[in-house]
Amino acid sequence: MNITDVRIRRVDNKNPGSKLLAYVTVTFDDCLVLHNIRVIRGQKGVFIVMPNRRTKVGEYKDIVHPINQNFREILQSAIFKEYVKENPSSLELELG
């Protein structure tokens, strides 16, 4: 499965403590689209969060997620590459 498009929607938060940097949409093989991946700046660096939902007991469960580390790294790398391309001066990536 190839990543054929990555679209970044940067979030300009008024709250200086907000960790959310952007929402991302990724297209695979020009036939499948995955919306609402989030780019977050955490204490250990920048990372992606897959789309999720909150359960009745308050836990968050991913709706979709990579099943191996190799694909997660490919996905994260494609997202970060596009983010830096669109926002060259706004982010020094400290990978988490």
Curated annotation (Swiss-Prot):
Gene3D superfamilies: Stage V sporulation protein G. Keywords: Cell cycle, Cell division, Septation. GO terms for biological process: division septum assembly; sporulation resulting in formation of a cellular spore. SUPFAM superfamilies: SpoVG-like. Pfam families: SpoVG. InterPro entries: SpoVG, SpoVG_sf. PANTHER family: SEPTATION PROTEIN SPOVG-RELATED. Could be involved in septation. HAMAP family: SpoVG (MF_00819). Belongs to the SpoVG family. This is Putative septation protein SpoVG. The lineage of its organism: Bacteria, Pseudomonadati, Spirochaetota, Spirochaetia, Spirochaetales. The gene is spoVG.
